Design a protein with these regions (language model features):
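Type III/flagellar secretion export determinants
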Residues: 1-108
Length: 108
């Protein structure tokens, strides 16, 4: 429910804890998957030959000066020189979150 989301979280100003609560809420409601939640929480997968490495990546709160909406818009607009299924998946996830955040902002 967008009205609930808009009343609980400000898309243009979220602390780290608020962002994590927001992402967890989306997962708990089935809006995003566990894998999508991990990605939004900053977990990234990098391949090196046959091995997979996971590492923490700064979230929109750290990069976007707490303006999650603007940072996710930026993420959704990226054009990768070497597109992969994973980078396109991340970009599409960002677009999905942008649409949620924009609707929240309209209802504030």
């Amino acid at each position: 429910d967008y009205d609930y989301l808009a009343s609980e979280w400000d898309p243009t100003h979220m602390s780290r804890d608020e962002y994590k609560e927001f992402v967890s809420y989306l997962r708990d409601k089935g809006i995003i998957s566990d894998e999508e939640k991990r990605y939004l929480d900053g977990e990234r997968i990098a391949t090196s030959g046959q091995s997979w490495v996971s590492f923490d990546y700064p979230t929109p709160v750290e990069y976007g000066d707490e303006n999650v909406l603007e940072y996710m818009r930026y993420e959704a607009s990226l054009v990768y020189e070497h597109r992969t299924t994973y980078t396109e998946w991340g970009k599409n996830l960002s677009k999905k979150i942008v649409s949620i955040l924009e609707e929240m902002e309209r209802r504030r």
